[in-house]
Amino acid sequence: LGLYPGEFERVPFEDDYFVDVERLKTFVKSCDVIVHLAAVNRHTDAHVLYETNMRLVKQLIEAMEATNSCPYVLFSSSIQEERDNEYGRSKSDGRKLLEEWAVCNGASFTGMVVPNVFGPFGKPNYNSFIATFGYKLTHGDSPTVLQDNEVNLIYVGSLCRHICDKIREMGSRTAPSLVERDDVACDFEMKVSEVLGLFENFKKLYFEQGIIPPLNNIHEMNLFNTFRSYIDMESYFPVKLVQHTDVRGSFVETVKIGVGGQVSFSTTAPGVTRGNHYHTRKMERFVVIKGKARIQLRKVGTDEVLDYYLNGEEPAYVDMPVWYTHNISNIGDEILYAQFWINEWYDPTDSDT
């Protein structure tokens, strides 16, 4: 939603609204649409998990009824509704409670039954086996496959687009209120062992050698961007490049790629900064060829800034993760020469910038 500030106005929400009834009431009164994603995914006590998830739904309903508010509610349930566990039951029962509220109050409701979600920054050992694989492989551990099932997977970006489209559809709807179960389609299916095999290849080529691996489709690209998100940015970058030097000068290999894209270079005057944008899908590499540079990265939604100092006398690169604002500044006294590789040709109509 934050990518479309001219279309959607986000109403701030904090977790502690669930322990402050008045603030929760104020929140629901301010909303035309509420997307309810809050839930406990795992807990050592299954009863606590179920009761917590149900309590969150009931508190939302109570706040809406107390304020006579009838926003369009989208609820994130799970394909685990069909499984015999407390998490699945909590999602199914929560969805049905919200359906009943919508019918009784003439409100619109979409109960999304969502496949297994993955994407950058998921919590290892909690959100997804993909998060666990990515974290372990980039932190010196070796994951194992416990159950090699075929898994329905959806990238978090696809789910967000689906939610945005649902809100748009409701905004243009002229018919009476709608109450629906929405079985969200997966992006693709893959065995757990196949995901692990891909990630092990990402580790071997990219994490250990700096080679951009072959990515055969958008799903593998999304998996690669997810893998990259678990790298410890502060300790991993910048990566020094090998210089081959003789009487003729120096030769440096800056990027080895298994995919296409676009290579460019820039000159930057002393004291000038380029960039200050982020990408949601693109991969990008900055290489300092000559001069002194500072590259800065900041994860969207946080205040921590990572500073990397590079010098053309020791050529090195920094790769830009998705959802990190980045820039490059000339901190020297001479012209800065930098090379950029990005995995897509620039398209001004879809710049992802």
Regions found by a protein language model. Name each.
Residues 7, 99-122, 135, 141-152, ...:
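Conserved beta-loop-beta element that borders a ligand/cofactor-binding pocket
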Residues 16-67, 80-84:
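NAD(P)H-binding glycine-rich loop region in Rossmannoid oxidoreductase-like domains
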Residues 55-105, 109-112:
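Conserved Rossmann-fold NAD(P)-dependent oxidoreductase catalytic core, especially the SDR/UDP-sugar
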Residues 158-243:
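Mid/C-terminal beta-alpha module of Rossmann-like enzyme folds, strongest
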Residues 182, 281-300:
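Glycine- and acidic-residue-biased ligand/ion/polar-headgroup-sensing regions
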Residues 235-276, 282:
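A short glycine-rich, His/Asp/Glu-containing loop-to-beta-strand
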Residues 299-323, 327-329:
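Short acidic-glycine-tyrosine-enriched beta hairpin
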Residues 301-304, 331-353:
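Double-stranded beta-helix
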